[in-house]
Every structure is written in C-alpha cells, then in structure tokens.
Amino acid sequence: MTKKLHIKTWGCQMNEYDSSKMADLLDATHGYQLTEVAEEADVLLLNTCSIREKAQEKVFHQLGRWKLLKEKNPDLIIGVGGCVASQEGDHIRQRAHYVDIIFGPQTLHRLPEMINSVRGNRSPVVDISFPEIEKFDRLPEPRAEGPTAFVSIMEGCNKYCTYCVVPYTRGEEVSRPCDDILFEIAQLAAQGVREVNLLGQNVNAWRGENYDGTTGSFADLLRLVAAIDGIDRIRFTTSHPIEFTDDIIDVYRDTPELVSFLHLPVQSGSDRVLNLMGRTHTALEYKAIIRKLREARPDIQISSDFIVGFPGETTEDFEKTMKLIADVNFDMSYSFIFSARPGTPAADMVDDVPEADKKQRLYILQERINQQAMAWSRRMLGTVQRILVEGTSRKNIMELSGRTENNRVVNFEGTPDLVGKFVDVEIVDVYTNSLRGKIVRTEAEMGLRIAESPESVIARTRKENDLGVGIYQP
C-alpha cells in the first residue's frame, strides 16, 4: 500500500521551495507520495512562517485539527518545521505533546532519520540547529514541475532589521557553492525549465565559493546562470538595497535573460523610521539605486515591501513614504501593518501608533500602489509582450496563461503544445489582476538558443570529485 505525505505550507517562496524538497526527499528515501487530503496521510508536515501576526497561535490551531486525526490513527506522524518551529522549539511539544517531530529550516534534510527514529522507538525528535549549508548536500536531484523553478542559493540574513525574525529563525547568511547552484539549474533545464528564480532572504548578498576556491559575486553568478542553454529568463528574490552594488546593475545592461522586473524592499520613505528599523540605508540612497537601474534598463518595473505604523511613525513620516512611492512609481507592493515579532528589538519599542491610523495608512498606500499598477498595465495595451506559457488559464481551462517579464498574468487562446514555450502576445485588454492577449509569434520564429540542448550541457560539465560527488564546472 502506498504511503502518503501531506505538507501544509505557510509563508514565503523559500518555504515553498523547502516544502518541495521535503516531498522529493521523502519520496526518494521512504516512497511517500504527496496527497492534498490530510486524512489520507501517514505523515503530516506543517511548514510554518513567523512573519505574520499571531503566527504561533495559527500553528496551534492547525495542530489542534490534526490532533483529531492522530486520535483516530495513533501511528500517524506529525511534524512541525519552518521558522515558528525554529523559534518555539520545545514549547511546541509542551503545548502539543502529540507532535512527533520539530525541525528547523536548516535541518529538513534530516527528516528521513527523524521519521525512522519516531517509527522505531516512538520518542519525539527536536532538531532546530543551524548546521551551515549541510542540507543542500543531502537533498535528491531536483524535479521540475513546469517551465519555471525556484532555486535556493543561500540561507539566512546578517542584517538584523529590528522588526525581523529571520536571522534568529534561519541563522546568518550562508552561501551555496557556485558549482552546486549551476548544476541544479542545468538539471532543471534538462527537464524543460526555461525560467529560474534565485532565492535567498538576502539574495544579492550571495558570496559563494567557485570551483577554483575563489569567492564569486552575485553578479558573477547571474551571468553564469544566463549562460546555461535552455534558461531564457532569470528572476531573483529577495534583495536588500545595501547589497545592490553597481556590478549587479551592470548585469542589467548586458544580460537580456535577467528580466526587467525587480522586487527591492524599502519598508519606509522616512529616514528616521528607516533608522529605527535598522535598515542601514536612506530613502535617497534607495532612489539612487533605482535611477541607475533605469539608466541601465529603462523599461524595468519595481515592486517593494512596506511596513506602516512602525513604532514612532508620524503622519509626516508616512507622507514621506507616499512621496517615495510616487517618485519611484512602484508597480506593486507587499504592504503590512506593523506587528511585533517576539524576540526582536522592535518588540520592545512602544507601539504608539493608533490602530485606526495604521489601517487608514495601509489603505491609502495600497490604493496608490493599485492605481500605479493599473497605469503600468494600461501602458502595455497594444504592445507585444513575450510570455512564458505556464499552463491552462485559471479563468478558462480552454485558454492558456503565462507571465510577462514584468510579472503580469496574461490569458490568451492557444494550443496545449505551447505550454513550456515562449510566445509573443499582443495585449488587447487590461483587467485588475490580469491582461488579455492574442498570439502574434511562436517560439519557432524567435531565434532562441538551440545550438545545444540542456542535456548536453550536463554531459559536458558534470565532473566528480574524489568522493564521487557530482559537481558542475562551467
């Protein structure tokens, strides 16, 4: 009988990536098949996020529902991972004694051993340590699930913004070696992936070891990824302004595979608030980065993160944020009302902004961003956009859907054989959350790189070290 695994994931794209790796790992080691139905599963894993308000209580509410399943099936294994697990540790076991496994983001690769231990002696396992980058050495080969893929290139963050728990839950910055990243991407390209999104909590701070022992920069890595045949689009998230150096901007000048869209969080337009947040940059420095980016890539569109109602934020501070939003002309944003995360310096600050003011500021900010986003969309009307076809449309299964370089969803008529390929589409209509288009050119007419297949890239570049471990050498 097939053993089944159910994973519930909350939070960022890094968590989504981690969950996919858990599924691949437990399939390879134990033969567990993913199921969307928790009641069918032999193992339940909750991959948690501590960014949002009341994250801990949300975890215990979910575990309470799973407790009922365990009462019916005592052999059911329940595991909690992610940032809340890293933060709370044994406290989860104290409140939810039926939880068998507690693991952090850096120890998910040990899940097979943890499950074996629980199966063997029924004693719970807690492992929320930070074993550097070890987890990437223990994961199976990547499996593509469509033409786009996420690839984690580093873990952790050294910035210690006063509101953020990431350095405490994922540890400080650790970069994967360059060869490991390139080989994983080449493997994905061999499976039909055309677009990769490089992931990290502070992705542009990547400083990985090259095959010759030297240290590479993020700009170096971007150019190496762009050189892999079959990879025609590169995205990355999330960046920090303080690490957005001129050499990265130069990549936008000479590397067309790097998309004309950037998510660069700023959080506030007030230097006083930025200082309270520990952001180590000013609003003017942020705008200088955007100015240089638009000189290098005039059509680039920018999204950002904003926190409103941070302790001490005045009406004048908020007005400076709104001015920055207008000056930069952001295309979209992830914006939130401040809520204190336990254990962070901001949690000890006096939360002196009235709740009504926070909600009003968030509404004003989001309305302005939405207006700017719609204006950007309307400018695209009548233009021809290159779309990576990702699958059928959510709105109409008889149509196809894909994304533009600037991350707009476009729905259009087309045949199933176009999935996983690029098409040029004329934008004929604009909606709030999507665009509509019609095909004017298919990939066969584009002259994309076809000299070498991704398979030949792997065959040419795979080497083995003295231990028999495969490495990628450009």
UniProtKB/Swiss-Prot annotation:
Keywords: 4Fe-4S, Cytoplasm, Iron, Iron-sulfur, Metal-binding, S-adenosyl-L-methionine, Transferase, tRNA processing. Residues 143-375 form the Radical SAM core domain. GO terms for molecular function: 4 iron, 4 sulfur cluster binding; metal ion binding; N6-isopentenyladenosine methylthiotransferase activity. Its cofactor is [4Fe-4S] cluster. Its main location: cytoplasm. [4Fe-4S] cluster 1 binds at residues 12, 49, 83. Residues 378-441 form the TRAM domain. One of its GO terms (cellular component) is cytosol. [4Fe-4S] cluster 2 binds at residues 157, 161, 164. InterPro entries: Elp3/MiaA/NifB-like_rSAM, Methylthiotransferase, Methylthiotransferase_CS, Methylthiotransferase_N, Methylthiotransferase_N_sf, MiaB_methiolase, rSAM, rSAM_horseshoe. Residues 3-120 form the MTTase N-terminal domain. Pfam families: Radical_SAM, TRAM, UPF0004. It catalyses: N(6)-dimethylallyladenosine(37) in tRNA + (sulfur carrier)-SH + AH2 + 2 S-adenosyl-L-methionine = 2-methylsulfanyl-N(6)-dimethylallyladenosine(37) in tRNA + (sulfur carrier)-H + 5'-deoxyadenosine + L-methionine + A + S-adenosyl-L-homocysteine + 2 H(+). PROSITE patterns: MTTASE_N, MTTASE_RADICAL, RADICAL_SAM, TRAM. CDD domains: Radical_SAM. Its EC number is 2.8.4.3. Binds 2 [4Fe-4S] clusters. One cluster is coordinated with 3 cysteines and an exchangeable S-adenosyl-L-methionine. Belongs to the methylthiotransferase family. MiaB subfamily. Catalyzes the methylthiolation of N6-(dimethylallyl)adenosine (i(6)A), leading to the formation of 2-methylthio-N6-(dimethylallyl)adenosine (ms(2)i(6)A) at position 37 in tRNAs that read codons beginning with uridine. Monomer. This is tRNA-2-methylthio-N(6)-dimethylallyladenosine synthase. It comes from Klebsiella pneumoniae subsp. pneumoniae (strain ATCC 700721 / MGH 78578). The gene is miaB.
